Regions:
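Substrate/cofactor-recognition hotspot
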Residues: 106
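Short cysteine clusters
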Residues: 103
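Cys-dependent protein tyrosine phosphatase-like superfamily
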Residues: 1-99, 112-206
């Protein structure tokens, strides 16, 4: 049964008992929230941000509860570099289970990462399940203009990988410039701001 904190933090299991997704745990309830679900590791898609209170709180509470805290940088409005996706797959491989994937709202970057998790875990046969992670309900994925590249990325990756495991393809061959060209060739102009360079430094974005 979903509790109040599950609704507040947009919590859902990706794979029950193994991997979950959520929003930033504001309002000071992160500790009980992690304990309630038995979370052993937290993958933070907002990257390392020690100058912001939310990051310091999240890191402190994770350590206090024996939860491994892993920082990975993704940007929902900019196409990821290869090293960013490699870091995400490395996090999937090393994170103790059950793991929790979260960004700010648990809607966009988290949907993207959850989809990649399923394909990484189960192979390309999980493509439809992966795409379901972008559903408006219950995940509240309502992408803004420059976030509309997130879901098409799955089709791009499937075509480029040609059956290879997604992490292997990413490490060996993924090129954000090819993704940019692929999107533009298919009429997805304006669905992203560019290729990621560096974080903007907004506490709400990151």
């Amino acid at each position: 049964m979903r509790g109040p904190s599950d609704v507040l933090y947009n919590f859902h299991w990706i794979v029950p008992g193994e991997a979950a997704r959520a929003a930033q745990a504001y309002a000071g309830f992160l500790g009980p929230f992690l304990t309630r679900h038995g979370i052993k590791s937290l993958i933070n898609l907002r990257g390392p941000n020690p100058k912001f209170g939310w990051w310091r709180y999240e890191r402190r509470i994770s350590e206090a509860h024996g939860v491994r805290h892993i920082d990975v940088m993704l940007d929902s409005r900019h196409l990821p570099r290869r090293d960013m996706l490699v870091a995400l797959f490395d996090a999937f491989d090393s994170a103790p289970r059950p793991l929790l994937i979260k960004c700010s709202g648990g809607q966009d970057r988290t949907s993207f990462a959850a989809a990649l998790y399923l394909i990484h875990r189960d192979g390309w046969v999980a493509r439809e399940k992966a795409l379901a992670q972008f559903a408006r309900f219950p995940y509240l994925h309502f992408p803004k203009q420059h976030q509309r590249w997130l879901q098409p990325f799955i089709a791009f990756a499937a075509g480029e990988a040609a059956g290879r495991p997604i992490a292997e393809w990413t490490r060996d061959s993924y090129d954000p410039a090819r993704l940019k060209n692929w999107l533009e060739e298919r009429g997805h102009h304006g669905t992203f701001k560019g290729i990621f360079e560096r974080p903007v430094g907004s506490r709400w974005q990151w």
